[in-house]
């Protein structure tokens, strides 16, 4: 079972709303076939949160969102 906490992610992205948007966008990227930056044994949402907590993905995800 995945043991990732929101507190770990909030250390990287302090705004919980931006955190939600970043995790959502990254999870969608993973579903589209992008390569995970951490161990990929979990669902895309959990992988996205793990990447954020590890510092591999950050607020820059919001700048990549197509308008």
From Swiss-Prot:
GO MF terms held by the record: DNA binding; DNA-directed RNA polymerase activity
Primary enzyme class: transferase
Gene Ontology annotations for the cellular component aspect, listed alphabetically: DNA-directed RNA polymerase complex
Keywords: DNA-directed RNA polymerase, Nucleotidyltransferase, Transcription, Transferase
Catalytic reaction list: RNA(n) + a ribonucleoside 5'-triphosphate = RNA(n+1) + diphosphate
SUPFAM superfamilies cross-referenced by the UniProt entry: RPB6/omega subunit-like
GO biological process: DNA-templated transcription
EC number(s) stated in the UniProt entry for this protein: 2.7.7.6
A Pfam family hit: RNA_pol_Rpb6
Keyword ATP-binding included in the entry's annotation: no
HAMAP family: RNApol_bact_RpoZ
Function: Promotes RNA polymerase assembly. Latches the N- and C-terminal regions of the beta' subunit thereby facilitating its interaction with the beta and alpha subunits.
Family, per entry: Belongs to the RNA polymerase subunit omega family.
Subunit relationships: The RNAP catalytic core consists of 2 alpha, 1 beta, 1 beta' and 1 omega subunit. When a sigma factor is associated with the core the holoenzyme is formed, which can initiate transcription.
Protein name: DNA-directed RNA polymerase subunit omega
